[in-house]
A protein has these predicted regions:
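Non-ligating segments of multi-cofactor redox enzymes
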Residues: 1-224
Length: 224
């Protein structure tokens, strides 16, 4: 198993339903700065009128995760399916992982007295055999699709085979597993929507990157 998520981000309406569902599902601490998932935005002008692009984000569960490398206590670690997790009992709040994460996907949970982040609903859903996350299940415009990259016949891989996509900050070399689907009619939309140049991938181009990183890191993955 190698869990990941595709996002048809052009369909995001910034309704915040995913953020609310995540907090309720996972008991995330209240507060605007306490988010496992969030919706970012960029602005542009189209035909002389202002236009806002929304792009949902969260922990990318990188296959070459720098947060895991810098953690002195192994609190940040890989678990089943290549998920990056935080063991709150081992976390000493050094915040090294927060500084190492290029996606700003971590925050301090004052109740747990530990760093917190998205887990793809590992404790509440994956361990119970469920195949969707809370954010996917609640999204009214079907932005997210969670799945297993090792399942060639699964819905996620089939979608990635049919659509081009990009990942955030690919130059960091983290091999992230959030895939942002490019609008079929306009590849330049991706560049405009995030405000900088980015490489557009096909699944055949990105799959070898995934496989190389998995071969390197999978010995660290814990079993369910």
């Amino acid at each position: 198993m190698n869990f990941a998520m595709a996002l048809d981000y052009q369909s995001c309406i910034n309704c915040k339903a995913c953020e609310v569902a995540c907090k309720e599902e996972n008991g995330v601490q209240l507060g605007a700065d306490k988010q496992r998932i969030w919706v970012g935005q960029t602005e542009e002008t189209i035909f002389g009128k202002p236009f806002v692009n929304f792009y949902p984000s969260q922990c990318n569960h990188c296959l070459d995760a720098p947060c895991v490398d810098v953690c002195p206590t192994n609190a940040s670690h890989f678990t089943v399916g290549g998920l990056v997790m935080v063991d709150k009992e081992k976390c000493i709040l050094c915040k090294g992982c927060m500084e190492a994460c290029p996606y700003d996907a971590r925050f301090v949970d004052d109740k747990k007295v530990a760093v917190d982040k998205c887990t793809f609903c590992y404790d509440t859903r994956i361990l119970n055999g469920e195949t969707t996350t809370a954010c996917q299940a609640t999204c009214p415009t079907k932005v997210r699709l969670f799945g297993d990259l090792d399942d060639e016949n699964g819905e996620l891989v089939q979608l990635l085979k049919s659509r081009k996509f990009f990942v955030l900050k690919e130059d960091e070399g983290t091999v992230p597993k959030l895939f942002y689907l490019v609008p079929e009619q306009d590849e330049n939309f991706a560049i405009r929507s995030i405000g900088h140049n980015t490489k557009i991938y096909t699944w055949d181009e990105f799959k070898p990157i995934i496989e190389k990183a998995k071969a390197k890191r999978s010995p660290q993955w814990k079993s369910m």
